[in-house]
UniProtKB/Swiss-Prot annotation:
Region forming the signal peptide: none
Membrane disposition: Multi-pass membrane protein
Keyword DNA damage appears in the UniProt entry: no
Keyword vocabulary terms for this entry: Cell membrane, Membrane, Transmembrane, Transmembrane helix
Entry annotated with the keyword Transport: no
Species of origin: Pseudoalteromonas translucida (strain TAC 125)
Pfam families: DUF1328
Cystine bridges: none
Domain of life: Bacteria
Protein name as annotated: UPF0391 membrane protein PSHAa0537
Amino acid sequence: MLRWTITFLVIALIAAVLGFGGIAGAAAGIAKIIFFIFLILLVISLVSGALRGKKP
C-alpha cells in the first residue's frame, strides 16, 4: 500500500506542476485535492507500518 501511495503522490505532484504551469489550469484544483489525499494516505501508511513493527 505504501508503494501505491507514493506512486499516486508523485502523479499528483506532476499534475500540480502541469496545472500551475498554465498547461492545464482546470487541473490545478484537482491536483491539490489529490495531493493532500495521498499525503494523508502516506502518513497513515507510515504510522500503521510503524505500529506493526515493519520497516517501510
